């Protein structure tokens, strides 16, 4: 029967799609585990750098550094980090929605697009981009974050940007990815007391005794060295957090797609069996009716 052939063809097609989604889920799960391990390993360094910057800034309060210079924000730059690929649920759309909301606050802004989805989104709207960073790969390297950071640092020092923000997805857990906006430039060093409490669990620790640090060659020189590293590490951290969020979102999306495909196969199979049963019943009735007529 033509209808039965159509059902079999549809079921075969859905089963093929289900296999692809299941394989993509397995790949995303493995990649998510690696990306999550990278994020967890990088967080202690980020906390410690945050704390050290607060101590050095407290010791060098009168130091003049270009990255600390606060200007009236007339020309702001946004680094927007998305994925290169889709099939990851609302991951990309959530980040882009947050970015558009932030950009609407300013009359003039510059864009640094990280990820093919971000580049295509702004290109479609004909929004000018100062730089594009595409194809960073699955294993983010510190040098990649360093390259992006140095680009905006040079622009900021040259006076082309008055402030720099970064929009990325913060990895909370496998189920939660939070679009986040952070200010990169001008750098706002934390107060020493706040920096010491920035480590979450460490906040509940007993208060440390005041320590008088000696900086060599000087606190100003140490601060000049730390500020660019702080920005570079912040960008790198945004990249790895976004990568972990992307893989988590893709894993959940493919898991949902696999389950939906299974439900669709069950519905189509049930409809096909009902149609086949109707055909068999009709044939039996015809046979019984023919036999009765012969009698």
UniProtKB/Swiss-Prot annotation:
Gene3D superfamilies: 3.40.1380.10, ATP synthase, gamma subunit, helix hairpin domain. It is found in: Cell membrane. One of its GO terms (molecular function) is proton-transporting ATP synthase activity, rotational mechanism. It comes from the Bacteria. It is a peripheral membrane protein. One of its GO terms (biological process) is proton motive force-driven plasma membrane ATP synthesis. HAMAP family: ATP_synth_gamma_bact. Belongs to the ATPase gamma chain family. This is ATP synthase gamma chain. The lineage of its organism: Bacteria, Bacillati, Bacillota, Clostridia, Thermoanaerobacterales. The gene is atpG.
